[in-house]
Regions:
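Long, acidic/serine-threonine-rich intrinsically disordered regions with weak helical/coil propensity
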Residues: 2-135
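Alpha-solenoid HEAT/Armadillo-like helical repeat scaffolds in large eukaryotic proteins
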Residues: 64, 80, 99-100, 155-160, ...
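Flexible loop/turn segments at the boundaries of HEAT repeats in alpha-solenoid HEAT proteins
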Residues: 89, 141-146, 177-187
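Alpha-helical solenoid scaffolds in eukaryotic proteins
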Residues: 55, 95, 150-158, 188-189
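Long alpha-helical HEAT/HEAT-like repeat alpha-solenoid scaffolds in very large eukaryotic proteins
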Residues: 1-5, 10, 155-156, 186-191
Length: 191
């Protein structure tokens, strides 16, 4: 439903939340809100780009109805980061990061960068780890399209600010591998 409602009817799934009477909100609708929140955020990976209402999603994220942990949202942004023309790709993440002063940015994101560039308890790669592994894979610089490469590079460049040396080193090596055959993208990324 989180995919069909926006694509067929041009409404976000979060519009359903408005149907919950305000006085009923506290009576056990938290589970419903959790489900709707997760469905809305997870649908961003699968929906047609033109069906995503960026303004509505951003308003929802800042509302009392959103039950999404910030790290969950940041992980989703990493997953979306390499999709060209997606409203929440690496260009969005870059603009989000640039709004903060360096101390606020470091205070807010260092734990995310340091904790989310590895593996979870089940040994599944977190989104940043998957991005590093992909950018570090053989022949990726030849195979990847220039726009996805640029977006991946923008995202990986933010990992260079990590206080964790291992992640900084891996991001550096992944960037070198990713951009080795795409000099134009390297120059554009540095601008």
């Amino acid at each position: 439903m989180a995919i069909l409602i926006p694509e067929r009817f041009a409404h976000e799934m979060t519009d359903v939340i408005r149907l919950i009477p305000e006085d009923e909100y506290e009576r056990g609708y938290c589970t419903c809100l959790d489900t709707i929140s997760e469905a809305e955020i997870n649908s961003l990976c699968w929906r047609a780009i033109e069906s995503i209402d960026k303004k509505t999603i951003r308003q929802f994220l800042g509302s009392k109805y959103c039950n999404i942990d910030p790290d969950y949202w940041y992980n989703k942004l990493v997953e979306l980061s390499t999709i060209p023309n997606h409203p929440f790709n690496a260009d969005y993440f870059h603009a989000l990061m640039m709004r903060f002063t360096m101390p606020k940015r470091d205070g807010r994101f260092q734990f995310f960068f340091n904790g989310c560039a590895g593996y979870d308890d089940n040994r599944c790669a977190n989104p940043l780890r998957r991005l590093i592994d992909w950018a570090w894979s053989e022949n990726v610089s030849v195979k990847a399209d220039p726009e996805s490469t640029r977006l991946a590079a923008v995202m990986l460049c933010w990992l260079l600010s990590s206080t964790y040396i291992k992640h900084r080193d891996e991001a550096t090596k992944a960037l070198v591998n990713l951009l080795s055959e795409q000099v134009e993208v390297l120059i554009e990324t540095l601008r």
